[in-house]
Regions:
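Intrinsically disordered, low-complexity peptide-like regions
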Residues: 5-9, 57, 73
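Mixed-charge, Lys/Arg-rich low-complexity intrinsically disordered regions
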Residues: 1-28
Length: 85
């Protein structure tokens, strides 16, 4: 589910500009300020000019870039995904 949504976002033909995701961080605590096991409301965008995903918390407090769908999926477990504009 998560990988498919990220790949759709990355697709140049996609009209989706962002994803809103509720996810639990499964990576290492302290990585860019995120805490293992905590749920976050995220906004994810794919920046084509940089070739990466940019993830920020909905409140804008935390940010983390990811180079691939695999890297993102390795650190997050999504419970809800909604396409944004």
């Amino acid at each position: 589910m998560l990988t498919r949504a990220l790949n759709d976002l990355k697709n140049p033909k996609s009209k989706t500009g962002s994803l809103q995701i509720i996810a639990t961080f499964t990576g290492t605590t302290g990585s860019m300020g995120f805490i293992t096991g905590r749920r976050y409301e995220l906004i994810v965008r794919y920046i084509r000019s940089r070739g990466r995903f940019e993830v920020k918390t909905r409140d804008g407090q935390l940010f983390c870039p990811y180079q691939s769908t695999e890297a993102f999926a390795k650190n997050w477990s999504a419970s809800a995904i909604q396409k944004g504009a």
